[in-house]
């Protein structure tokens, strides 16, 4: 276990805690959105950022759990802590859009976005948008959320002169994926489902998303960094749906896992520490720059994933669940393929070369998949 305490170039190690890596940092005047902030490392990240003076918007699936976490954090921090709790179900694109609209109604700037929430399911499950659940929750939901909040971040960093930071929480588990890295067919048709591979694919997608986003932001000359972190092996509620894994983690946890306070350290370091200023498109572990798999640095795969994700976020707004779900499986798949091809043509015409340059949404009447679409005051409202 000596490696756990060995400090890297940053001066920190795997044994460092979130409070230690942010000691002396003044976050007053900053606003952060943290997904999955009601428990685990998300909650600890929210607590430590609030401790440093950051106003934290806790994006949570369970509002009651979020409210309890908020109360506990505020009771602990002397002088109070600025915390808001908003509902967000990352498996539903409609919920992501509602969250973005609710956040916009707060009229807050946005300096830091931490895409922390994740799920590891035991069974093969589709999201309400028809996507494999790991991919929908761990990647697509965060992809859409990031794009919907990005214009706010651009305005904030421009007006304040302070670098914006996007932190995507991935995992060393990204190495457990398909031979081709991302098997796009499995996202729409998860036959032969393997939960570990599905999870690994979604975590690989987190890194690829980060890298492509970083490239786009650099090309635009925007002062926003995007980095990925591996929090380490932690016995968190991520495994609550996997009884065997939970038992295993409880058995060997004291040997191989780290505490919640240590698990949140790398996220807090990348989100707040001055050492990370100007660093973007990197993968961090143990509060230091680390090396992900070769697939994770595949620029062409990152572009393919970006286009695929964009097409799915655009395509779902045309679907009425009440009618679509009643169609035969072959017709549903044909419809999705046609929609993907249409969106690909839009992309080729240059309308969607970046996360901000999208066409206006088409006129719609009635409902849509997973709920009603709420128009957002951003140029990217087509998402």
Language-model regions, residue ranges each:
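Alpha-helical packing segments of well-folded alpha/beta enzyme cores
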Residues: 69, 99, 209, 263-267, ...
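C-terminal helical subdomain
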Residues: 96, 202, 228, 251-292, ...
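Rossmann-fold NAD(P)H-dependent dehydrogenase/reductase core
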Residues: 3-5, 10-244, 313-330, 343, ...
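C-terminal tail/cap regions
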Residues: 1-20, 246, 274-343, 383
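Intrinsically disordered, low-complexity proline-rich regions
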Residues: 359-363
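Low-complexity, intrinsically disordered or signal/transmembrane-proximal segments
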Residues: 347-348, 356, 368, 373, ...
């Amino acid at each position: 276990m000596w490696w756990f305490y060995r400090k890297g170039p940053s001066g920190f190690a795997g044994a460092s805690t979130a409070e230690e890596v942010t000691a002396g940092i003044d976050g007053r005047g900053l606003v952060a959105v943290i997904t999955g902030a009601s428990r685990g490392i998300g909650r600890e990240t929210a607590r430590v950022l609030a401790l440093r003076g950051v106003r934290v918007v806790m994006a949570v699936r369970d509002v009651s759990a979020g409210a309890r976490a908020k109360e506990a954090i505020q009771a602990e921090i002397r002088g109070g802590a600025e915390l808001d709790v908003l509902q967000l179900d990352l498996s539903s694109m409609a919920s992501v859009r509602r969250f973005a609209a609710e956040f916009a109604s707060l009229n807050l700037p946005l300096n830091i976005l931490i895409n922390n929430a994740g799920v590891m399911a035991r069974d093969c499950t589709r999201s309400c948008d028809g996507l494999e659940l790991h991919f929908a929750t761990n990647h697509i939901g965060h992809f859409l959320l990031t794009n919907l909040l990005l214009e706010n971040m651009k305005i904030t960093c421009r007006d304040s002169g302070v670098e914006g930071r996007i932190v995507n929480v991935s995992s060393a588990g990204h190495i457990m994926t398909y031979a081709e890295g991302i098997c796009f067919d499995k996202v729409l048709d998860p036959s032969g489902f393997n939960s570990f591979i599905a999870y690994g694919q979604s975590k690989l997608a987190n890194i690829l998303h980060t890298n492509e986003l970083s490239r786009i932001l650099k090309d635009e000359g925007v002062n926003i960094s995007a980095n990925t972190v591996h929090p380490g092996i932690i016995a968190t509620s991520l495994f609550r749906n996997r009884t065997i894994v939970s038992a295993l983690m409880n058995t060997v946890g004291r040997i191989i896992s780290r505490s919640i306070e240590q698990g949140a350290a790398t996220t807090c370091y990348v989100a707040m520490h001055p050492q990370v200023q100007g660093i973007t498109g990197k993968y961090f572990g143990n509060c230091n720059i680390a090396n992900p798999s070769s697939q994770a640095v595949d620029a062409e795969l990152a572009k393919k994933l970006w286009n695929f994700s964009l097409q799915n976020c655009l395509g779902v707004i045309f679907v009425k669940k009440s009618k679509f779900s009643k169609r035969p499986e072959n017709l549903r798949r044909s419809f999705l393929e046609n929609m993907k091809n249409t969106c690909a043509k839009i992309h080729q015409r240059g309308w969607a070369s970046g996360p901000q340059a999208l066409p206006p949404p088409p006129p719609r009447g009635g409902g849509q998949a997973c709920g009603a679409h709420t128009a957002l005051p951003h140029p990217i409202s087509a998402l």
